[in-house]
UniProtKB/Swiss-Prot annotation:
Keywords: Repressor, Ribonucleoprotein, Ribosomal protein, RNA-binding, rRNA-binding, Translation regulation, tRNA-binding. Belongs to the universal ribosomal protein uL1 family. Coiled coil: none annotated. This is Large ribosomal subunit protein uL1. The keyword Transmembrane helix does not apply. One of its GO terms (biological process) is translation. GO terms for cellular component: cytosolic large ribosomal subunit.
Length: 234
């Protein structure tokens, strides 16, 4: 316990939890304090001025991170025939139809993202109670119900990150690893923030991005000046 307390004290040292830091400074501070024995994930959390209980204030979309996430994303694809072959050629980890349905229905979910061709959705829809709560249900709004399965697979493998606002008006995502350079993490954060801004619903009133914080898996959260996460900021 003493070692844990000392580690927590060290990572909290010199962090003013009441201050809003510029994005670059916040990322540097988080990286410096990511001292676990594994490559910690760098995460962003954004508090939005929306009430997702109202349909016209739902925020959902996909962000394409220019430097990837640092994770090996396993992709499952529901497709038949030529589309199934395209998915395999693009690097999909699992490709199937009724066989994939039976596997998932039986509790085997060993993938991080699920893609389907439109004709497969009547079958996939029956898995809603399993895939929905895990945010794995294919959806045309985020490009996971598509005829371009090859493009969707490559995007998923290359750094596409889905986001969806939670009940408290928060969106969050892993946007890189502590081993990434500060510049790469900043680029990823700005790409994520840009996608969230573009997804602003018509029903949102007043200030949209209210609070932003950056953290690592085992580290502290550092508050960020929201103005510095916009793509045009430096």
């Amino acid at each position: 316990m003493a070692k844990v307390a000392k580690r927590i004290k060290n990572i909290r040292k010199d962090v003013d939890f009441n201050q809003l830091y510029a994005l670059n400074d916040a990322v540097s501070m988080v990286k410096e304090r990511a001292v676990a024995k594994f490559d910690e994930t760098i995460e962003i959390s954004m508090n939005l001025g929306v009430d997702p209980r109202h349909a016209d204030q739902m925020v959902r979309g996909v962000a394409h991170l220019p430097n990837g996430t640092g994770r090996n994303i396993r992709v499952a694809v529901f497709a038949r025939g030529d589309k199934a072959e395209e998915a395999k050629a693009a690097g999909a980890d699992i490709v199937g139809a009724e066989d994939l349905f039976e596997s998932i229905n039986g509790g085997v979910i060993d993938f991080d993202r699920c893609i389907a061709t439109p004709d497969m959705m009547p079958l996939v829809g029956r898995l809603g109670k399993i895939l929905g709560p895990r945010s794995l249900m294919p959806n045309p709004k985020v490009g996971t119900v598509t005829l371009d399965v090859a493009g969707a697979v490559k995007a998923s493998k290359g750094g596409a990150v889905e986001f969806r606002v939670e009940k408290a008006g928060i969106v969050h995502a892993g946007i890189g690893k502590a081993s990434f350079g500060v510049e790469k993490i900043v680029e990823n954060i700005k790409a994520f923030a840009s996608a969230v801004i573009k997804a602003k619903p018509q029903g949102a009133k007043g200030e949209y991005i209210k609070r932003v914080a950056v953290s690592s898996t085992m580290g502290v959260g550092v508050k960020v000046d929201p103005a510095t996460v916009r793509s045009e900021s430096v």
